[in-house]
Amino acid sequence: LGLRGVSKNARQAQIDEVLSRTGLQRFARTPARVLSFGEQQKLALARAWALNPQVLFLDEPTASLDPAGTRAVEQIIAAIQSGGTKIIMTTHDLGQARRLGDEILFLHQGKLIEKTEAQSFFERPASNLGQAFLNGDLLW
């Protein structure tokens, strides 16, 4: 925020607001190096959100997190979405795609196979590859 010319007082207000919206107030003065991996993931999302992006790209944002950490990160992602930021996320987690996705772009071997609403993809995939993936028959 400082690089964007935001004053110190405005920066602090914006940081406090984002920490509050993400439930991370207790980490306001904690050095990132002492946080767990899951806490670092949550803080990284909060930092990105503080910039008020129109689009946020997330690559496997919950990889290597335990279920509680995954749930917490997904809650922050949902809050960011509800604030109007478009999220583009890669995931191999079908449950996560179902919970967070409104549109699915299904790729296989670098090629776009399907682009559709999430509900349509999970209920009626338009391709045999999409169906095989949902059935667990397509591993890579």
Regions picked out by a protein language model, each given a short descriptive name:
Residues 2, 9-27:
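Conserved ABC ATPase "signature" region
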Residues 52:
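Conserved catalytic motifs of ABC-family nucleotide-binding domains
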